[in-house]
């Protein structure tokens, strides 16, 4: 007699441990933003850090705690510095605490904005209406929220072409 396979899930094996890790990530992220002025805008990535990223893929699961520890050690210290107030290179927008919380909430919902009658579509429509009102566009004009400046430029070029 064959036993059916155990149900697989993407849920954490330990919700409380994942909750603690998420809270730690939020605390560390806020500390990173709060103390950004105390760090250099940018620093070169040491060869030893690049070497760690070139290691073969792990053959066994490493766990969320391990992945977060790696992020703190080899990613956070060597970012481009876009959140630093002395970054004047290009418009990318500074990472802000409200934006980080908003990104977290959006990731939790993970909405598909392609269609359907769910509240994120209504929120998007309202934000577009507010933007039209603020800049004085006609109420019947349309709009679209995109992921960032590169996508906005791409969409703008496509609209201009067509």
Residue ranges of each PLM-predicted region?
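N-terminal entrance/gating region of PLP-dependent enzymes' catalytic architecture
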Residues: 2-140
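Conserved beta-loop-alpha segment that forms the PLP phosphate-binding cup at the N-terminus of a helix
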Residues: 124, 128-129, 140-162
């Amino acid at each position: 007699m064959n036993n059916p396979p155990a149900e697989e899930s993407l849920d954490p094996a330990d919700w409380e441990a994942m909750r603690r890790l998420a809270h730690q990530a939020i605390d560390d992220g806020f500390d990173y933003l709060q103390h950004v002025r105390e760090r250099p805008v940018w620093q070169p990535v040491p060869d030893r850090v690049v070497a760690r990223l070139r290691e073969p893929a792990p053959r066994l699961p490493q766990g969320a705690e391990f992945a977060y520890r790696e992020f703190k050690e080899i990613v956070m210290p060597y970012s481009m510095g876009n959140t630093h107030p002395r970054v004047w290179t290009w418009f990318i927008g500074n990472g802000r605490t409200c934006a980080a919380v908003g990104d977290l909430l959006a990731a939790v919902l993970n909405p598909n904005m392609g269609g359907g009658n769910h509240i994120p579509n209504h929120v998007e429509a309202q934000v577009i209406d507010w933007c039209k009102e603020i800049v004085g566009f006609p109420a019947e004009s349309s709009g679209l929220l995109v992921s960032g400046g590169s996508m906005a430029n791409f969409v703008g070029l496509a609209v201009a072409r067509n």
